[in-house]
């Protein structure tokens, strides 16, 4: 859980910007999106292997 306290003489926009930055740094939003819907274990394995295959192909390319 990210917590941001508005500082003295700080605009709300600046505080919101700091909050968004802290949320993106600690991965709260990504974790929420990942857990938003249930994924069967078989689907998780399939996505994981596809991602590994994609990374492997990406590393193998040479320009």
UniProtKB/Swiss-Prot annotation:
<dbReference type="GO" id="GO:0005840">
    <property type="term" value="C:ribosome"/>
</dbReference>
<feature type="region of interest" description="Disordered">
    <location>
        <begin position="40"/>
        <end position="63"/>
    </location>
</feature>
<dbReference type="GO" id="GO:1990904">
    <property type="term" value="C:ribonucleoprotein complex"/>
</dbReference>
<dbReference type="InterPro" id="IPR018278">
    <property type="entry name" value="Ribosomal_bS21_CS"/>
</dbReference>
<comment type="similarity">
    <text>Belongs to the bacterial ribosomal protein bS21 family.</text>
</comment>
<protein>
    <recommendedName>
        <fullName>Small ribosomal subunit protein bS21</fullName>
    </recommendedName>
</protein>
<dbReference type="InterPro" id="IPR038380">
    <property type="entry name" value="Ribosomal_bS21_sf"/>
</dbReference>
<dbReference type="GO" id="GO:0003735">
    <property type="term" value="F:structural constituent of ribosome"/>
</dbReference>
<keyword id="KW-0689">Ribosomal protein</keyword>
<dbReference type="GO" id="GO:0006412">
    <property type="term" value="P:translation"/>
</dbReference>
<feature type="compositionally biased region" description="Basic and acidic residues">
    <location>
        <begin position="40"/>
        <end position="52"/>
    </location>
</feature>
<dbReference type="Pfam" id="PF01165">
    <property type="entry name" value="Ribosomal_S21"/>
</dbReference>
<dbReference type="InterPro" id="IPR001911">
    <property type="entry name" value="Ribosomal_bS21"/>
</dbReference>
<feature type="compositionally biased region" description="Basic residues">
    <location>
        <begin position="53"/>
        <end position="63"/>
    </location>
</feature>
<keyword id="KW-0687">Ribonucleoprotein</keyword>
């Amino acid at each position: 859980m990210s917590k941001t306290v508005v500082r003295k003489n700080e605009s709300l926009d600046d505080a919101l910007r700091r909050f968004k930055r802290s949320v993106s740094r600690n991965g709260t939003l990504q974790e929420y999106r990942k857990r938003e819907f249930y994924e069967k274990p078989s689907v998780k394995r399939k996505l994981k292997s596809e991602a590994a295959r994609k990374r492997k192909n990406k590393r193998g390319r040479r320009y």
